[in-house]
Amino acid sequence: MQDYRTPQRRPQRPQKPQKRHRRRSFGAVMLTILLCALLCLIGIFAAVYFMGVRYIQVRISDTSYVKFLGMVDDEGYPYKGRIIYSDGISAEVNLDRNQIAYSNGDVYEGELNRNLLKEGRGKMLYANGDVYEGTFVGDLISGEGTYTYVNGDVYEGSFANGVKEGAGTYTFADGSTYTGSFSNNQKNGSGEYRFAEGDAYIGTYVNDLKEGSGIYTYANGDVYEGQFVADERSGKGTYTWSNGEQYIGEFQNNMMSGYGTYTWPTGREYTGYFENGIIVRAAESAGT
């Protein structure tokens, strides 16, 4: 007899959990973690900000700048932290002590402007042993000051844009002194040079060399008064020896060269042409 009972269905296998649900759960966890991390970072930055820590960049010119990372005061101006200059040198600044310690070993103590540039009175101690004490303008030595070199030389006078400019006195370690005009770090203009061995020169200079009119007095009593070219007696001048002899005439390369008159204490006199300090030809007499 035919069995009309409803066929039984096979029991279905239990379905595996959908992976997408797991992915959604993992993504939610990661999102929560990221949000927490972001909030923590925001909190840290906010705390740092309210503590007064800032990053500031100041452009000095088209090619130079100063970067600062550190503490600022109530007005937002930096006073303690690290400076990085466009030339690669870095420094630690502490305005509580008015000091900047550079990475190359230099140390500055003195006044600074709001852009952390040396401005006003200050003292610069260089790593090589040189010391400058005086005024600064725009981070450069400018104005009146004293620069002491490690070898014992000392310059006291005017500066501009980091170089000797104007009136000043340079004292050498051996005792020689120059007092007069400077330009672009060199003796330029009128000045007086007194050598340690007793010589003295009063006259004009161009780029550290005697040039133009001057008087040179030698330690032995000789005196030359006349023109100089490239640190040598050249042109017209008068040389008087300590024994009374005298030459008035033309010079070249420190020697009597050209037309001149040589006189002796006895009254003897020679007028003619000289070459490298030697008489070569007497002057022609009138009517010959």
Report each predicted region and the residues it spans:
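N-terminal Lys/Arg-rich, disordered targeting/topogenic segments
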Residues: 1-26
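Conserved anchor residues at repeat-unit boundaries in beta-strand-based tandem repeats, strongest
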Residues: 67-79, 83-96, 102, 107-118, ...
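Beta-turn initiation residues at beta-strand->coil junctions
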Residues: 58-61, 83-86, 100-105, 123-128, ...
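Hydrophobic alpha-helical membrane-insertion segments, chiefly the h-region
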Residues: 39-49
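Short low-polarity hydrophobic stretches
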Residues: 27-30, 112, 122
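N-terminal Sec-pathway targeting helices
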Residues: 19-39
